[in-house]
């Protein structure tokens, strides 16, 4: 836990370090509890643990510090598999993500990415944060943007 002014306590020192290291265009995966984080991270991304933390809480905290990309899609989710599409499965957590992204200045759109393509994209991410999120299809990728000079300290 980090106890600093203005830094949400859900952001660990390891996660803060990774956020600071990331550059424009680097991607961060916020992985749900069922995501194969350790397997994916064997391919290169840094593995960060946030066990027990729900993604909306973590996303809200991250977006206080993390500029979203405005030149390209800023967020992506794992698309439903065909059988879940046929069932008409709803994914209410996506609405929460969209609202948080809008509050951070994004249009709130999230590109749906086919399941196995999502895994491959995650292997190229800068880091994967393993969370305690239990919602189905809770995985989210966010892309880092730039901080304009007038917003820099």
Curated annotation (Swiss-Prot):
Substrate binds at residues 32, 78, 119, 137, 139. Its EC number is 5.1.3.29. Involved in the interconversion between alpha- and beta-L-fucoses. GO terms for molecular function: fucose binding; L-fucose mutarotase activity; racemase and epimerase activity, acting on carbohydrates and derivatives. The keyword Isomerase applies. The gene is fuom. PANTHER family: FUCOSE MUTAROTASE (PTHR31690:SF4). Keywords: Isomerase. One of its GO terms (biological process) is fucose metabolic process. The keyword Isomerase applies. The active site is at residues 24, 69, 119. The lineage of its organism: Eukaryota, Metazoa, Chordata, Craniata, Vertebrata. Disulfide bonds: none annotated. InterPro entries: RbsD-like_sf (IPR023750), RbsD/FucU_mutarotase (IPR050443), RbsD_FucU (IPR007721). Pfam families: RbsD_FucU. Belongs to the RbsD / FucU family. This is Fucose mutarotase. It catalyses: alpha-L-fucose = beta-L-fucose.
């Amino acid at each position: 836990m980090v106890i600093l002014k203005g830094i949400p306590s859900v952001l660990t020192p390891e996660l803060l370090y990774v956020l600071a290291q990331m550059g424009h265009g680097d991607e961060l995966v916020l992985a749900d509890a069922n995501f194969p984080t350790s397997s994916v991270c064997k391919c290169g991304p840094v593995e960060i643990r946030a066990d027990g933390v729900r993604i909306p809480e973590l996303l809200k905290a991250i977006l206080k510090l993390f500029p979203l990309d405005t030149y390209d899609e800023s967020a992506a989710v794992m698309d439903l598999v065909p059988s879940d599409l046929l069932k008409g499965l709803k994914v209410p957590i996506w609405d929460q993500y969209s609202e948080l992204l809008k509050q951070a200045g994004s249009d709130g759109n999230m590109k749906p990415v086919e399941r196995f393509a999502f895994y491959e994209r995650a292997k190229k991410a800068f880091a994967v944060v393993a969370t305690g999120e239990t919602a189905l299809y809770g995985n989210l990728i966010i892309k880092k943007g730039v901080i304009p000079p007038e917003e820099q300290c």
